[in-house]
Structure formats: C-alpha cells, structure tokens
Amino acid sequence: MATIENFATVRYTSCGVTETKVSNLAEIGLESAVTLTKNTLGDTYGEDSVLTYIITVTNTSSSPISDITVSDDLGTFEFGTQELTPLTYTPPALLLIDGQDTSAQLTVDNSVAGSVTFSFPTLAAGATANIIYKATVNEFAPLEIGSSITNTATLESSSDCADGTASATVTVSEGANVSVFKQMSPNPVVCGDTVTYTIRIYNYGNVPAEDVELTDNFDPAPTNITVSRDGVLLVATDYTYENGTLSVPAAGSTESVTVPAATFTRDIATGVVTVTPGIVEYVITGTI
C-alpha cells in the first residue's frame, strides 16, 4: 500500500521576531483503485511446457481508469552478472472485459528482452478485465527437482491510485521422461550372417525410471542370440527368449532395471541449461 505523507508550515511574528513552526508528519495509507491477481492453469512445468496465465484487473473505484499497462517479467532472474528469462511469450493474447472478447483493444509489446507488456485504453468503474496469454518454457528454465519459476505482473495507469503487482509460481514437475532408440547393423545383412540390434533407453526426466522392462518381437527371429546391457553380457537366465520375443528381465525375475535421471548443467557463459539423459543400452546379436 502506498503512503501519503504531509506536513504543514506556520510562519508568524511575535514581538517583532518572525518565527516558523513545522507540524508533525501526518500519514495515511493509499489503497489502489484496482485489484490485480495472477493465476496459471496448472501449477507445474517441464522442458518445453506451454503455460497459460490469466491476469485479472478489477476497477474497484467509482470512476473509470485509463491508459492501463500490465508488464510481465516472464520469470527473469539474476545469474551471475546476467539476467536470464526462463519463459518466452507465445502469442496470441486475449482480453476479456466483463466476459466479452475485447481483444481488438489489446496491444502487446514483447520487443524488450525479459518482458511482455499488455496495454488497453480504459476500464469502467466496477469492471473486470482478464488478460489470457501463454508462455513457453525455454532453454534457461531450471529443471532440477525443487526448481520453480516465479513471474511478476506490474500494473500502471494514468491514475496514481491504480497500480499494483501480482505474482504466480510454478514448480518443476517430477518424473521420468523416457524415449527409446533402436538401430540394426550391418545394412544390408546377408542370410546366415550375424545381425546386431542396439537399443538405447534414454531418460530426460529428473527422476529415475525404475522397474524397466524391455520387450522386443523379432521378425525374422534371430538364433543363437546374445544379450548385453551397458557392456555386460547377460546370462540366459537374465532374459526370456521364446518364439522370437525377447523379454528383459526374464519373466518372473526379481531383477530391477533402472534408467538414471538426467543431469542438468547450466553454462556459466550463456546460462543455457543442457540436459544429459540417463541411459541404459542393450546390444543383442543373433544369426539371421
């Protein structure tokens, strides 16, 4: 809340002498003529997530306010001597006033790095405006467990009594993010030769992928197969291979395979976060 401070000065003459007296400092609180709130649809984010934000401006005064601007810092934070912005404004934006689409009145400016500014001309007494927009998580966003992004909206207008700030925080989602890559060699292969299948299981998430089970249906089915995991040859009891279908671990096995969580490294010079996935690699060989 802003404060209005004021004091009075009295000058007078007594017995031919001019004197001055200053009153005490009087203070009153100045409440804004608007309420400003900021919310998100969902409260978590991940790599490349698209977040939806809603900024709500309500004119609680008895007079209209004009020249309204709302600036969002897109979560900008300090990193060493740099300022990094983990969110990228993703157009378009919508403006709803008392539930009516008035987006034609909305001006959006994202030409200044680290912010986006929304402007509209007026808001009637008692009216409510909702600015709805999206932002995409970019390469500067922290992804480790416990990370968060807080972005703050700042409202200004032609009235000294119509301003304010509001923030919203999203936390990084926790979980594994698995992808699988497979390749075969040589190419081409001749009947009777040995073929090698390489399967890599990547985890781009911040939590390990546990109890991983691999199933592969080969057609045609190779014979005399060998199976290795991360360079270690597995014995026949470590997997099941029947009718061309490979299962690792073996059916009924108590063995648990885990793909480690990714590691996240922020470049000191650029601030960019690099994701290095956890990996488990299987190599299967057999005769075609």
Residue map of PLM features:
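Exported/extracytosolic protein signature
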Residues: 1-288
